Amino acid sequence: MVSLGVFARKFFGSAYERRLKVLRQKVAQINALEEQFVKLSDEQLCQKTDAFRKRLSEGENVDSLLPEAFATVREAAKRVYDMRPFDVQLIGGMVLHDCGIAEMRTGEGKTLMATLPIYLNALEGKGVHVVTVNDYLASRDAETMGKIFSFLGMTTGVILHDLDSDARRAAYACDITYATNNELGFDYLRDNMAFDRSQMVQRGHHYAIVDEVDSILIDEARTPLIISGPLEDRTDFYNLIDTFIPALIPEDYEIDEKQKTTTFTEVGTEKIEKMLEQAGYLKGESLYDIENVAIVHHVNNALKAHKLFVRDKDYIVRNDEIVIIDEFTGRMMPGRRYSEGLHQALEAKEHVAIQPENQTLASITFQNYFRMYRKLSGMTGTAATEAEEFRNIYGLDVVEVPTNLPVQRLDEDDEIYRTAEEKYRAIVRDIRQAHEKKQPILVGTTSIEKSEQLAERLRKEGITDFKVLNARYHEQEAYIIAQAGVPGALTIATNMAGRGTDIQLGGNVEMRIRQELQDIPEGPERTAKIEEIKKDVKQLKEKALAAGGLYVIATERHESRRIDNQLRGRSGRQGDPGRSKFFLSLQDDLMRIFGSNRMDGMLQKLGLKENEAIIHPWINKALEKAQKKVEARNFEIRKNLLKYDDVMNDQRKVIFEQRMEVMNADDLSEMIHEMRNDVVEDLVETYIPSGTYSEKWDVKALEEELQQLFNLELPVKEWAKEDGIAEEQILERILDAVTKLEDERTERYSPEVMAYFQKAVLLETIDTLWRENLVSLDHLRSVVGFRGYAQRDPLNEYKTESFELFQSMLKNLRRIVTSKLMRFEIIQQPTEPSMPEQTGADSSVFNDQNQENAPPLWARSQENRFVNPQDRDPNDVTTWGKVGRNERCPCGSEKKYKHCHGAFV
């Protein structure tokens, strides 16, 4: 019997089919305009941009411009590059405009498709960010697609890692900006560490299109972007801890490859304790005593570095440095470092220079960064397997965009062998057969080590004409990929995700022109050579097609089905023929971790002989089930990370908004006044609680606090003896005294100097306390999980305690800022120029490069001048010169300088 759901789908169509139907109707509207737009001159087509902007300014909705705007871009692409976007690309463009994820097969033209919604949304004048995975793709796409936008009167900028602030600011000011996800995130963090608005580079987060969206928003979601500063050097300690691990035997520790964790057994813990005790580092009796928390952390990192992290798979050693390898793409990630001491443990393991640990100055995850955009969309070749995560976390629906031509690639069943040795023999045999008929072959491996092992096997078998593409040789990446579709080409590559360059049968025309004609100037000779190259590529493509198209061989299944699909998708682009096959063994990581012992026993019972493969749908289903388990686990990890990061993100928003308010304010006196009153009220409430008798008042402590914070000596003790006096009256008298002191101080300096000093103190204090708060939150996060053993929800505990930390930080902020502003003295050298005006980013005061090592204006004083103590006037701080921290304060208080006027210097 047919279910109601099946009947309804047959009658009404699925949600996907209904959505496609609506999009195809819009495509028909765009196509109907084509004849009209073809007749326009170049100038008339360019003028469409101003006409659209005018209509928007008059109140028209951007959605209503879509058919005309898309028709405009289509016509411009035809005139600039002789490329006419297909109907399916128009569909993909509409998905992106509607804040969805367009899943398009490799080679279907995602880059050109993106120009349609980019142009439409850039008309609003608020900036469009196009996000790529590396600088090469950002600059390539900005250069190629920028010509279309320039033709239509729009500006295009690109953010590269080596640009200075002025160049970045100019790029962000363009209508369209191409950049990597890392550069965007770090620029956002740096903007929120700036002293002045003129130092900021970004101008908001209006609309972003993320290329390879699954790589950026899924694979990298677990890694926060961190700007950090160095802590003390502990090289000797890391090297010492590293010497302990080789002395351990397998019984001393346990490894969980599924969860990627390591733990010491009881025997192993005793061994480590003895070694630490002999080295003089163990405090108390046990490694797990509270005094040894930091040591436990470092010992665990050393164990992880040796037992979980594999050289040439997880990282490589290059130029005396540990360089992380992206597990999903096989790319090196220079500049990235593991946090919390793990990177230092790896450096000690490999005996390279150990860099100091860093303190977090600012951080954000990609999840929270990209959720700031008012409109967010993405495109990729593989997103369907992660559709639930995109919907739950980012509110993005995945739409599979139909291919322009039917896919002709043959995806063959997996071949499974008992051992890795048998598997590699079969792979080499298959490669030889395909190579002999000149079929282009792409072999995908999961690590550098395995790609080089396969390369060595091929050499021993007499096959030497191949290219290896992995993190070691990434500089040659684009050229190797460009030639991977040539007849007879054999390319061995680590994971292909995010490579960004299509494998075109016959070779890549543009790449060959750049390589072969770089020294030939424009002219008849160059034109003739270009035609020769095009003709040659066309002939080579015909040979590659005759050989069966690109053959993709995978040597292992990845944890994620998406990565496997990306590798398959390299073949069969734009309707070309091709084939793909996975060769597996029970010794592969995925099979070994997820229960291959049971499978091995079954295969033995079935009588599987050496060098025999088994091909069975049941095994494919078992593999897919294992992959789904890993994907679900990783999703839970990312979802959990987001829950904790959301707590920090709420605090981050408050702090960054507060900083922005301070930076933008011309007059901060009202904010300072409120802070000062809050501090005084808190003090009075602490030492003279409302509703209590005077006998309970601690007026002596209140007097000391007032002296410490405000440098005010007030007779609070005498006031408290007055008949019938209430705490409100004492509060009022203190506020009057503080206000009088503040007014006297304000009169001594110009409004410009006061405003500058107030801003400097506020921003410096906010940044310092926020850094300390981040450290506290990290520590809280690392231990809060143990609350689960006490039947308490770790997340709720984290929320509660992080809120208390935040409240404490804000209270400290008010106290420190108030005290600094009530106690400061600005001492200006006679030769010091007058307060300069801000003239923009190049002003000598506001330019980071010019002022890199100089103290801010308010801190430049005669404090380094040594003065005879007899020549110091207690009432004139300008006569004190340099005062030692432990000297008696020259003011006459008899306190040490560091506890009096030097408390906040």
Curated annotation (Swiss-Prot):
May bind 1 zinc ion per subunit. Keywords: ATP-binding, Cell inner membrane, Cell membrane, Cytoplasm, Membrane, Metal-binding, Nucleotide-binding, Protein transport, Translocase, Translocation, Transport, Zinc. GO terms for biological process: intracellular protein transmembrane transport; protein import; protein targeting; protein transport by the Sec complex. It is an enzyme of class 7 (translocase). CDD domains: DEXDc_SecA, SF2_C_secA. It is found in: Cell inner membrane; Cytoplasm. The keyword DNA-binding does not apply. GO terms for cellular component: cell envelope Sec protein transport complex; cytosol; plasma membrane. InterPro entries: Helicase_ATP-bd, Helicase_C-like, P-loop_NTPase, SEC_C_motif, SecA, SecA_DEAD, SecA_motor_DEAD, SecA_preprotein_X-link_dom. One of its GO terms (molecular function) is protein-exporting ATPase activity. It catalyses: ATP + H2O + cellular proteinSide 1 = ADP + phosphate + cellular proteinSide 2. It is a peripheral membrane protein. Its main location: membrane. The keyword NADP does not apply. Part of the Sec protein translocase complex. Interacts with the SecYEG preprotein conducting channel. Has a central role in coupling the hydrolysis of ATP to the transfer of proteins into and across the cell membrane, serving both as a receptor for the preprotein-SecB complex and as an ATP-driven molecular motor driving the stepwise translocation of polypeptide chains across the membrane. Belongs to the SecA family. Monomer and homodimer. Part of the essential Sec protein translocation apparatus which comprises SecA, SecYEG and auxiliary proteins SecDF-YajC and YidC. This is Protein translocase subunit SecA. The lineage of its organism: Bacteria, Pseudomonadati, Pseudomonadota, Alphaproteobacteria, Hyphomicrobiales. The gene is secA.
